[in-house]
Amino acid sequence: MRFVLASASPARLSVLRSAGIDPLVRVSGVDEDAVAAGLTDPTPPELVTALAAAKAEAVLPAVAAEAPDAVVVGCDSMLSAPDGEIVGKPGTPQAAAERWRKAAGRSGELLTGHAVVVLRGGEVVARTQGHLATTVRFSEPTEAELDAYIATGEPLHVAGGFTLEGFGGWFIEGVDGDPSSVLGISLPLTRKLLAEVGVSVVTLWGPPVAR
């Protein structure tokens, strides 16, 4: 059975490879704004889980033809900022700077949603989904440090405008909860969801792959 990651995230791919899974990567191309617009007053956990499910569902036709026996995992992340705002990817340097100034010296909650779909013989036989919240404690970068960080381009395209494993790690005081969820895919949550649909994660392991 193939493990299929419905995400273009290098961080998620790296986490899986270091944990013994070399997935088939298929990018969903889901319009996240359209998915969100189709929901009625979703809570943050409902939104992040719905987005993860949409990504997994979007790749099913292609995966069914290519790997008819597979487990497909979709993921989404967003930050519940210290001021209560729910934020995704900043997109612009100005938005990234504003978010960092609001978060500096405070804590936010990183929400990660996962959806798992099992295919056998090209047909869906099981689905499940869930979410996890992890507290992230932000440092207080100087203006010069913040300018330099934003200039790397890294915070523009990641949920909440920060990374734990890249340049952003210099400005994170700590994480309370599952660190892999902050990287985009929670290993404990994924294992739990796989078990719910009758798949043991150890059957998907291969030798660790260089990141």
From Swiss-Prot:
E.C. code: 3.6.1.9
Listed PANTHER family: BIFUNCTIONAL DTTP/UTP PYROPHOSPHATASE/METHYLTRANSFERASE PROTEIN-RELATED, BIFUNCTIONAL DTTP_UTP PYROPHOSPHATASE_METHYLTRANSFERASE PROTEIN-RELATED
Enzyme class, spelled out: hydrolase
UniProt-recorded Gene Ontology molecular function terms: nucleoside triphosphate diphosphatase activity
Domain of life where this protein originates: Bacteria
Keyword match Cytoplasm: yes
Cofactors required: a divalent metal cation
Listed GO CC annotations: cytoplasm
Name the UniProt record assigns to this protein: Nucleoside triphosphate pyrophosphatase
Matching Pfam families: Maf
Active site: D76 (proton acceptor)
Organism: Saccharopolyspora erythraea (strain ATCC 11635 / DSM 40517 / JCM 4748 / NBRC 13426 / NCIMB 8594 / NRRL 2338)
Principal localisation: cytoplasm
Family listed: Belongs to the Maf family.
Keywords: Cytoplasm, Hydrolase, Nucleotide metabolism
UniProt-listed Gene3D superfamilies: 3.90.950.10
Substrates-to-products reaction catalysed: a ribonucleoside 5'-triphosphate + H2O = a ribonucleoside 5'-phosphate + diphosphate + H(+); a 2'-deoxyribonucleoside 5'-triphosphate + H2O = a 2'-deoxyribonucleoside 5'-phosphate + diphosphate + H(+)
GO biological process: nucleotide metabolic process
Function: Nucleoside triphosphate pyrophosphatase. May have a dual role in cell division arrest and in preventing the incorporation of modified nucleotides into cellular nucleic acids.
Localization per Swiss-Prot or TrEMBL: Cytoplasm
Presence of the UniProt keyword Translocase in the record: no
